[in-house]
From Swiss-Prot:
A Pfam family annotated for this UniProt entry: Ribosomal_L34
Coiled coil: none
NCBIfam families to which the protein is assigned, alphabetical: rpmH_bact (TIGR01030)
GO terms of molecular function: structural constituent of ribosome
GO cellular component assignments: ribonucleoprotein complex; ribosome
Protein name according to UniProt: Large ribosomal subunit protein bL34
InterPro entries listed in its UniProt record: Ribosomal_bL34 (IPR000271), Ribosomal_bL34_CS (IPR020939)
Protein's organism: Mycoplasmoides gallisepticum (strain R(low / passage 15 / clone 2)) (Mycoplasma gallisepticum)
Gene3D superfamilies: 1.10.287.3980
UniProt family annotation: Belongs to the bacterial ribosomal protein bL34 family.
Source domain of life: Bacteria
GO biological process, one term: translation
Keywords: Ribonucleoprotein, Ribosomal protein
Amino acid sequence: MKRTYQPNKRKRAKTHGFRARMATASGRAVLAARKRKGRHILTVSDEAR
C-alpha cells in the first residue's frame, strides 16, 4: 500500500510556503497568529534560511 506522505519540496512550498500563505486572508491570519505566538519559523519557506 502506498503511504500518504510522499515528500516533494515544490508541492510543500506551493501549499505551505510564504507566498501561498500571503495569497489568502486566512493564510495571512495564520502568519499573524504565528508571529503573535513568537514563532521563529513562520512558514516552510523559512526552514531553508
